[in-house]
């Protein structure tokens, strides 16, 4: 039995959508993108959605269109995918690294609070692995310091924080549609916002700074999504709640059948909906095997695993700084391990994975 750590799920609907676009002759950005944006904004309970060609572009566009630039600081969690920080550097600003909560792995409000300076212009909170960060205290800090809040929702399509979908809780929400995500467009991303003027700036930024054809009123990039990607996205969006329901089913199964092991299972924040982009456990020093030994044993049995993430961002060579301390992020990076939780994992495979984990330990 071979069980991959991630596997995109696409069917006849996606194939038909791509075929429809190919037959239309509109292969770049056109009506499919506009339709997908409208549907995604409605799904996220946001007023505007702007489609882009990847999640990093979404973050870059959100920051740059908010005026973030040279001399500014943006607080980001160190335990995340590196794009959470590089989007800041792409604007000429400086990422400042906050530590994370040891239970939920998301940005620690107390750590973030200590990092605010006169140069702080934004905070990027990451809804990591499908779990919302604690938005209220971070949003309050931003209001107190006249900073904006950006949601990195690349892994959290459909997550809910205190009754509200993520993506509409700050200045902007930034999503990724990479093939391993909860829904995909192949490659792609989206920015959601409730600010019409800001949305217009983002639209110019992702289209060479054009306010109308061949009239360039600001600097910008080509971050446009194609109609092919958007057509796939519309088909996937119809299935997203079903995908997330299956992910939750799989996570619940793990919770029930691995609770007697000494592996630390993922905690779930109250009043929130976790959509389990990843099911991330901790293999601590108290465990009988090292994380690497456990991963090798599972690999030998055909079970895919992964480490998200082995090096915290503040320890990456491009950002390594002696004056940055994020001890929780550093500890997590040495302990975390992801198990397959995607919608194509069957009950039979779940049983096999749990039986194997219990056997090897």
Annotated model-derived regions:
Residues 1-26, 31, 340:
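N-terminal "arm"/small-domain region of PLP-dependent enzymes with the aminotransferase-like
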Residues 26-73, 87-91, 97-99, 164:
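Phosphate-binding glycine-rich loop
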Residues 34-38, 46-49, 110, 122-126, ...:
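PLP-dependent aminotransferase class I/II
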Residues 50, 75, 96, 148-150, ...:
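Structural detector of well-ordered beta-strand residues that form the stable sheet scaffold
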Residues 64-153, 160:
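PLP-dependent aminotransferase-like
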Residues 168-204, 210, 227-230:
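Active-site PLP attachment segment
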